[in-house]
Amino acid sequence: MGKIPIKRILAIDYGKKRTGLAKTDPFCSFAQPVGTFPPEKIITIIKSFLQENSVEKIIVGYPLNSDGTKNPMTGIIDGFIEELSAAFPDIPVEPIDEHGSSKQAGKVLIESGLSRKKRQRKGRLDSAAACLLLQHYLENTGNA
């Protein structure tokens, strides 16, 4: 009997300085951090990730203002989504509203009991934000 391929969802919290990645567990039930990486290396990092993991979808945090309008970062993300779609044409890329995800991730890190010094490592915040984006996505699509 053949092995059933396990497909994951990959979430990206793209930033100018750091980009957080998160993935689902093998059953697409909950989010797990992958790490934080320099944005200029993220396509290479994802290619490496895909060599070891089957991904059915990539979701990207999409920065909108609280009133739903676009902001300067939205254009950067639009370009990044085009780059992702070109690099991985067989994997759908879906933008999802990320409004407040970094702020919420900061609160989660505080509640987790991490010391202020450890919380201030920005990489933790970016990967936590990617996890929150993904968990929110899973809950809203009925996967969690």
UniProtKB/Swiss-Prot annotation:
Enzyme class: hydrolase
UniProt GO BP: rRNA 5'-end processing
Sequence similarity: Belongs to the YqgF nuclease family.
Origin organism lineage: Bacteria, Pseudomonadati, Chlorobiota, Chlorobiia, Chlorobiales
EC assignment: 3.1.-.-
Keyword annotations: Cytoplasm, Hydrolase, Nuclease, Ribosome biogenesis
UniProt name for this protein: Putative pre-16S rRNA nuclease
Subcellular location: Cytoplasm
Gene Ontology MF annotations: nuclease activity
The UniProt record lists the keyword Hydrolase: yes
Entry-linked PANTHER family: POLYNUCLEOTIDYL TRANSFERASE, RIBONUCLEASE H-LIKE SUPERFAMILY PROTEIN (PTHR33317:SF4)
Function of the molecule: Could be a nuclease involved in processing of the 5'-end of pre-16S rRNA.
Keyword Nuclease: yes
InterPro entries: RNaseH-like_sf, YqgF, YqgF/RNaseH-like_dom, YqgF/RNaseH-like_dom_sf
GO CC aspect terms: cytosol
SUPFAM superfamilies per UniProt: Ribonuclease H-like
NCBIfam families linked to this entry: RNAse_H_YqgF (TIGR00250)
